């Protein structure tokens, strides 16, 4: 996406879309990782976790796992920073938390969590739709008038992006993010 569409969206949405595009094109992976403080990742995820319809046990699992992280790193470019938190201790609720955050708006472009404990993840179309609608609201991309649900993901022709949610109980994984 070289040029953003000519629609009535605010500067924060444009900033967020530029960061999302950088992340989705793979250019955000061109820098080296550096160890970062867990507080930085928690701060970046705070609004996101509050906005999404996670069960309270999921929010607690994320925060508990981040606070007890074995390793946390960040890498990124001018617009996007990707945080990864690993827990080697399988007693922790989450084994891995990954979040790509657009720097200017501090909005999450993509998020995934892999649980190491027996947390039940409800996987239904209505649950996925709830996550997608909350994400569009949270990211303020709900201002784009053409988001259409195609049976598995939302798609905006205006910006050429999909919004996908995976709730995988078998692999104990939750993923939410924009995709090409």
What is the predicted role of each segment?
Residues 10-12, 17, 32, 37, ...:
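Serine/threonine-rich low-complexity intrinsically disordered regions
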Residues 19, 26, 57, 68, ...:
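Generic detector of low-complexity/intrinsically disordered segments
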Residues 25, 53, 104, 136-140, ...:
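Short, flexible coil/linker elements and helix-boundary hinge sites characteristic
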Residues 35, 86-148:
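Long, charged/polar, surface-exposed segments that mediate recognition or autoinhibition
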Residues 57-102, 148-180:
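Exposed beta-strand-loop-beta-strand "reactive/processing" segments of non-cytosolic proteins
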């Amino acid at each position: 996406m070289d040029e953003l569409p000519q629609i009535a969206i605010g500067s924060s949405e444009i900033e967020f879309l530029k960061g999302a595009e950088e992340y989705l094109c793979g250019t955000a992976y061109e820098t080296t990782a550096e160890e970062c403080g867990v507080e930085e990742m928690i701060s970046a995820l705070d609004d996101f976790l509050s906005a999404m319809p996670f069960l309270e046990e999921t929010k607690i699992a994320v925060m508990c796992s981040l606070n007890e992280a074995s390793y946390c790193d960040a890498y990124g470019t001018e617009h996007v920073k990707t945080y990864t938190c690993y827990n080697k201790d399988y007693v922790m609720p989450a084994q891995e938390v990954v979040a790509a955050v657009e720097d200017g708006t501090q909005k999450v472009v993509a998020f995934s969590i892999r649980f190491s404990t027996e947390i039940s993840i409800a996987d239904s179309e209505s649950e996925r739709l709830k996550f997608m609608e909350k994400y569009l609201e949270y990211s303020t991309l709900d201002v784009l008038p053409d988001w259409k649900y195609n049976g598995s993901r939302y798609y905006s022709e205006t910006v050429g992006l999909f919004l996908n949610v995976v709730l995988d109980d078998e692999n104990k994984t939750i993923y939410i993010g924009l995709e090409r």
